[in-house]
Swiss-Prot record:
Its EC number is 1.2.1.70. Homodimer. The record marks H97 as: Important for activity. One of its GO terms (biological process) is chlorophyll biosynthetic process. PANTHER family: GLUTAMYL-TRNA REDUCTASE (PTHR43013:SF1). This is Glutamyl-tRNA reductase. The gene is hemA. Possesses an unusual extended V-shaped dimeric structure with each monomer consisting of three distinct domains arranged along a curved 'spinal' alpha-helix. The N-terminal catalytic domain specifically recognizes the glutamate moiety of the substrate. The second domain is the NADPH-binding domain, and the third C-terminal domain is responsible for dimerization. Keywords: Chlorophyll biosynthesis, NADP, Oxidoreductase, Porphyrin biosynthesis. SUPFAM superfamilies: Glutamyl tRNA-reductase catalytic, N-terminal domain (SSF69742), Glutamyl tRNA-reductase dimerization domain (SSF69075), NAD(P)-binding Rossmann-fold domains (SSF51735).
Length: 425
């Protein structure tokens, strides 16, 4: 049994590739059902910064190939497009990655907590789809607990720690516009709400919310005391705005080149566009329009570098906490790896003992019932004595999965024996 994770991240994969691999929330249930044809357990995490597929498989090599094939087939993207920048983790490396991720240590914005909600959402969908089993349940709930502990006991999450807050940092370079200009927020999800909070905190008062589902737009606007407009007014709302933050979950372009070209006509101040969505909401060609400044999530990276430098000391403290939590999980994991091997080892020994005793007793019909019981008891005692030391060693958390694998090879215990319900893929 192996835990395997493959993924692409903002650090080494451009948004042009990430948006082709991204899954919307609506797509996840069907995608997870497809994933279960390849693996025992699975979960998909798709955010503006990363796309990751994590699964429990029966071997590392087969798991790697299965997850690559799944991602390519589901997204209709040739493996040659994403494999060069793909990262692959196994077992303890997967656990460490997910624990660090939940603590905000692997985020574009160091310490950000939006990832916690994204992990919980992905976990809930995977549970509802029947894709989560005991291993990933333990890993992911352990990750959430470890992340919470790291944030509680360090300053990793102090200050501005979200992609939205980084966008606001960029807006501060246009201080007059931020306080006196007109802002448009496209979307009505968590990121849109976070944008509203930051804009209001910065003193921006002329804010409009627009969303494809108008009831969500009106509810969000009412909650924060700002204006809202129906989706059909998007082009007009854009033309009346100086700052636009777009963060929908749409599968394609929401703000077209034509809309922005119209909005830029006769403008005395620059039009600032922040595209925080993946796939991207705004046609990237708008950068060619005079007076238009476009920032996508990758363009905000320089600000994030400064953020990470300021939190370096707290990050080290958080890493130490994560190390301890990963060690606890690995103790459980080694034990879980050993249990089916110990069971199979006992069954193999018992089968051999039983067969040999039957043959021996068949050759000695003169033995009395009491003598037969003595022979059976002797054989059982010998088996127990012989297996005692190997079983104690297998149960030792310090032994590691290497010993489990070695015992399975020595006693010819295969996957079908240890995992009788194993899928054939």
């Amino acid at each position: 049994m192996h835990i395997t994770l493959i993924g692409v991240h903002q650090r080494n994969t451009p948004v042009t590739v990430r948006e082709r691999l991204a899954f919307s929330l609506r797509e996840l249930p069907d995608a997870l059902l497809a994933l279960r044809r390849y693996v025992e357990e699975g979960i998909i995490l798709s955010t503006c910064n990363r796309v990751e597929v994590c699964a429990v498989t029966h071997d590392s090599v087969g798991g790697d190939a299965a997850l690559k094939s799944f991602l390519a087939e589901q997204r209709g993207v040739d493996q040659a497009v994403f494999v060069p920048s793909l990262y692959i983790y196994h077992n303890e490396a997967v656990v460490r990655h997910l624990y660090r991720l939940a603590a905000g240590l692997d985020s574009m914005v160091l310490g950000e907590d939006q990832i916690v909600g994204q992990i919980k959402e992905a976990l809930a969908i995977a549970h509802a789809s029947g894709a989560i089993g005991p291993v990933l349940h333990r890993v992911l709930h352990g990750a959430l607990a470890a992340g919470k502990r790291a944030r509680t006991h360090t300053g990793i999450a102090s200050g501005h720690v979200s992609v939205v807050s980084v966008a606001i940092d960029a807006l501060r370079q246009h201080a007059d516009l931020l306080k006196q200009g007109r802002a448009l927020v496209i979307g009505a999800g968590h990121m849109a709400e976070l944008t509203l909070k930051h804009l209001i905190a910065e003193g921006c008062s002329a804010i409009t919310v627009i969303n494809r589902t108008e009831t969500r737009a009106s509810a969000l606007a009412q909650r924060y005391g700002v204006a809202w407009r129906p989706w059909g007014d998007l082009s007009d709302a854009l033309a009346m705005s100086d700052m636009v933050v777009s963060c929908t979950s749409a599968p394609g372009i929401v703000v077209s080149w034509q809309m922005v070209e119209r909005a830029a006509v006769g403008r005395s101040v620059p039009l600032l566009l922040f595209d925080l969505a993946v796939p991207r909401d705004i046609d990237q060609r708008v950068v060619e329009i005079p007076g238009v400044h476009l920032y996508d999530v990758d363009a905000l990276e320089p600000i994030c570098v400064t953020n990470r430098a300021m939190r370096a000391a707290e990050a080290q403290r958080a890493e130490a906490i994560i190390d301890g939590e990963v060690a606890k999980f690995m103790e459980w994991w080694v034990a879980q790896q050993a249990v089916p091997t110990i069971r199979a080892l006992r069954e193999r020994a018992e089968a051999i003992r039983d067969a040999e005793i039957r043959r021996a007793l068949a050759r000695c019909p003169e033995l009395s019932p009491q003598q037969r019981e003595t022979v059976v008891a002797l054989s059982t005692a010998i088996i127990n004595k012989l297996l005692h030391e190997p079983i104690v060693a297998l149960r030792d958390p310090e032994a590691g999965s290497e010993l489990v694998s070695a015992v399975r090879r020595l006693f010819n215990i295969d996957d079908a024996t240890v995992h009788p319900s194993a899928k054939v893929t």
